[in-house]
């Protein structure tokens, strides 16, 4: 499976979301020659107990840029504020305009079911944009140089934190990507977000920012190894959007080969 379009877009609600969700997979795709684009809808303006919204926004923007430089990715901020991401007309047109500008072949974003509404609304806006971007008569007000896309891209949802929805119900991924050889790069990229350690310790009771990510990716790898019989120390996990008009084949399996391990139910 090949395409002349080598662009991959990863969209998170806040700076550091993409790093946590899927940066190991992005490093793997970068090694294959893919062009990586990372979007944060907000600058994380509520993510501090020490700084004002303006101060923490500047800090987190710089942190996100440094992290993306390590990945060799282009970084964008979509102009939203924390806790103010909504599924409305203006927001849909804004994200659609950005998607048209980048014109990705593969898109990764949050799970539709997650622990906070910013993540869930981001997931919905990205899903909408993947579909809307290819409709010529759907007009956007900014980035007007970008025309409609020719195809609907592959769309993948990363696993929510702890693999659960808001009711604590387990969300089983469709497949896992072995990122064992890339975990150090992922750690270095996530470590760029220094401002978040104090915030997560105070608000979420999470003192071990990096170690929490390691444990989560290790638990995903344990399941991946169990179902596949392959060795994996760290893994990321995804579900593919398989609704009408979206691509149905798993392009990750084609690109990453033995590095992809699929749940038997799929």
Kindly label every feature range from the protein language model.
Residues 1-102:
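Active-site rim/loop-helix segments in enzyme catalytic domains that contact anionic ligands
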């Amino acid at each position: 499976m090949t395409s002349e379009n080598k662009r991959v877009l990863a969209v998170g609600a806040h700076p550091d979301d993409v790093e946590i969700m899927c940066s190991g997979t992005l490093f793997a795709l970068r090694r294959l020659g893919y062009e990586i684009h990372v979007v944060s809808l907000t600058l994380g303006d509520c993510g501090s107990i020490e700084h004002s919204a303006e101060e923490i926004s500047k800090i987190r923007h710089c942190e996100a840029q440094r992290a993306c430089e390590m990945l060799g990715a282009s970084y964008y901020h979509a102009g939203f504020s924390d806790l103010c991401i909504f599924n409305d007309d203006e927001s849909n047109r804004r994200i659609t305009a950005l998607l048209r500008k980048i014109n990705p072949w593969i898109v990764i974003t949050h799970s539709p079911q997650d622990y906070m509404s910013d993540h869930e609304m981001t997931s919905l806006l990205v899903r909408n944009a993947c579909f809307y971007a290819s409709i010529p008569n759907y007009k956007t007000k900014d980035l007007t140089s970008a025309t409609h896309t020719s195809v609907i891209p592959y769309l993948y949802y990363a696993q929510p934190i702890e693999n659960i929805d808001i009711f604590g119900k387990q969300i089983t991924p469709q497949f896992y990507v072995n990122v064992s050889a890339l975990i150090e790069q992922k750690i270095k990229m996530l470590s760029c977000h220094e401002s978040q350690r104090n915030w997560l310790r105070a608000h979420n009771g999470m003192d071990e920012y990096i170690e929490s990510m390691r444990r989560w990716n290790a638990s995903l790898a344990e399941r991946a190894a169990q179902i596949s019989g392959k060795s994996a120390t760290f893994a990321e996990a995804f579900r593919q959007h398989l609704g009408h008009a979206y691509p149905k084949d798993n392009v990750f399996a084609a690109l990453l080969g033995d590095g992809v391990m699929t749940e038997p139910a799929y």
